[in-house]
From Swiss-Prot:
Protein name, UniProt field: Defensin-like protein 98
Family of the protein in this entry: Belongs to the DEFL family.
Source domain of life: Eukaryota
Signal as UniProt keyword: yes
Disulphide bond pairs: C33-C76, C40-C62, C46-C73, C50-C75
Location relative to the cell: Secreted
Keyword annotations of the record: Antimicrobial, Disulfide bond, Fungicide, Plant defense, Secreted, Signal
GO biological process, one term: killing of cells of another organism
Chief place where the protein resides: secreted
UniProt KW Signal keyword: yes
Extent of the signal sequence: 1-29
Length: 88
């Protein structure tokens, strides 16, 4: 009976470790949307604009500007954590 418990624990540990190794790693840092990319009508059109800029950008935000009826697309990118910046 004891060996059954040990084997069950071993299988559970192996399953948990494999799930952790397979799952995508979280990006260290925060998403900042501060690069203007022109005007937009919706978030989906802004995402399309920013995705054409390359791998450094991860979508975009369509934000209202100071002019009525005009929205500005801001492309988003990840900024490293403060610990990462200090190591540079």
């Amino acid at each position: 009976m004891g060996s059954l418990r040990v084997s069950t624990v071993v299988i559970a540990v192996v399953a948990c470790l494999s799930i952790l190794l397979i799952s995508p790693t979280e990006v260290d840092g925060r998403l900042v949307c501060d690069t203007p990319a022109g005007t937009c009508t919706s978030s989906s059109t802004c995402n399309d604009q920013c995705n054409t800029w390359g791998g450094n950008y991860s979508g975009g935000e369509c934000a209202d500007s100071s002019f009525p009826g005009l929205s500005i697309c801001y492309c988003c990118h990840y900024v490293g954590s403060s610990a990462e910046m200090e190591s540079m």
